[in-house]
């Protein structure tokens, strides 16, 4: 079956484009961009981040959760 519509645009790494070398766990506004509305860490295939920065991002989000800067889950009743 042939793919229809426009071809998908290749995702680029946010951190490489903006020349961010280290991801800081205290930068909550940046980390929230990579967390779903349910509080789950978004995968690389969705965000387009490189493997190196995805590992740093995961560690930073987990640290921010431990010291209560980010919630583990959100309650959207």
UniProtKB/Swiss-Prot annotation:
- Recorded source organism is Halalkalibacterium halodurans (strain ATCC BAA-125 / DSM 18197 / FERM 7344 / JCM 9153 / C-125) (Bacillus halodurans)
Question: In which domain of life is the source organism classified?
Answer: Bacteria
Q: Does the keyword Transmembrane helix apply?
A: no
Disulfide bonds, paired cysteine numbers: none
Question: Which keywords label this protein?
Answer: Ribonucleoprotein, Ribosomal protein, RNA-binding, rRNA-binding
For this protein, the record's InterPro entries field holds:
Ribosomal_bS18, Ribosomal_bS18_CS, Ribosomal_bS18_sf
Q: What is this protein called?
A: Small ribosomal subunit protein bS18
* Record GO terms (molecular function): small ribosomal subunit rRNA binding; structural constituent of ribosome
**One Pfam family linked to the record:** Ribosomal_S18
Which family is this sequence assigned to?
Belongs to the bacterial ribosomal protein bS18 family.
The UniProt subunit note reads as follows:
Part of the 30S ribosomal subunit. Forms a tight heterodimer with protein bS6.
**In the UniProt record, which is one GO cellular component term?**
cytosolic small ribosomal subunit
Q: Name one GO biological process term.
A: translation
**Per the record's keyword annotation, is Ribosomal protein included, yes or no?**
yes
Function of the molecule: Binds as a heterodimer with protein bS6 to the central domain of the 16S rRNA, where it helps stabilize the platform of the 30S subunit.
